[in-house]
Amino acid sequence: MRLICNQAVGGSSPSVGSKISIQVNANAQTELVPRRAMSATRLDGKACAADLEERLKNRISECSVQPHLAVIIVGDDPASHVYVNNKVRSCGRLGIKSTHVELPADTDQEVVVQHILDMNKQDDLHGILIQSPLPRHMDEEMLTELIDPRKDVDGFHPVNLGRLVQGRSDGMVPCTPSGVMEMLSWANVDLTGKKAVVLGRSFNVGMPQALLMAAKGADATVTIVHSRTKDAQAECREADVLIAAVGRPEMVKSDWVKPGAIVVDVGINRVDDSSRERGWRLAGDVHPDVSETASLLSPVPGGVGPMTVAMLMANTVTSAEMMSDD
């Protein structure tokens, strides 16, 4: 599937960082051209998230209500509990009230349903998040659709995804794609007229990422690459901006990347590593050797992950602001 933005491409754009420049060829297509052999500049998600948190503190201080986030976690998946604890700590730093509901793995689905319905009725609660994954006997899609769309701070409710398709800005946007957009803006990356490739088409990352990049105001020309794409490597190598969100460790090698391209690694995968005391390490979807080809590269960990949590906080604050105005 290829999404083509209708905006004409032409003219010059400011260079991004010191490693790349923008040139216009005879066909009026913008290209990222390396000035020299490069080592990618780190696209630091931690620093970007810290900057966003400072802005959120100002918004919270001006809000007439205290933002309040509720997280429901079912089961004892260790990684899920780490993620939830990170979110609760972020709430504490910002002054967002948090409610943390822990349920055993054998909990009946109707119990979760009732929690959601009760939370929907709470006027002083602005965000509801169901931590994935859920036990197999639970229907995550159905549970997500029960959440009041105004409180759907994950941005996965069909109402919010539908607003995203319409190009509307009055809904909750999925946290990882919006976090990527925030990172690119923070790094002064101008997407106008650039060829962007999104590797992956999941409903929670790949598809909304493509929509955000093609939307008016971002104005990239977007290609979605997926498992049925005939030559994924060739498509990726054409990208000025490559977003890897496929969930396959180190799939994107340096020969998949155009010299000087901007690469955002959304993947976070646990891979076996006998050299580590714990027996594993975290790896992204992008191989480390891409740092010798790209101009900007987000690390794993420390890239998109912190931004996903920061955007969850931002969605919670936005929900509180909107609900206090009703």
What are the language-model segments listed below?
Residues 74, 79-88, 168-258, 262, ...:
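Glycine-rich phosphate/diphosphate-binding loop of Rossmann-like nucleotide-binding domains
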Residues 38-65:
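Positively charged, low-complexity intrinsically disordered leader regions
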Residues 143-148, 152, 161, 267-323:
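Rossmann-fold NAD(P)-binding glycine/threonine-rich loop
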Residues 111-123:
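Short, well-structured alpha-helical segments in soluble
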Residues 91-105, 221-224:
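Short beta-strand elements in bilobed, periplasmic/extracellular small-molecule ligand-binding domains
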Residues 130-195:
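Anion-binding alpha/beta catalytic cores of soluble intermediary-metabolism enzymes, centered on
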Residues 127-140, 238-274:
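Glycine-rich phosphate-binding loop
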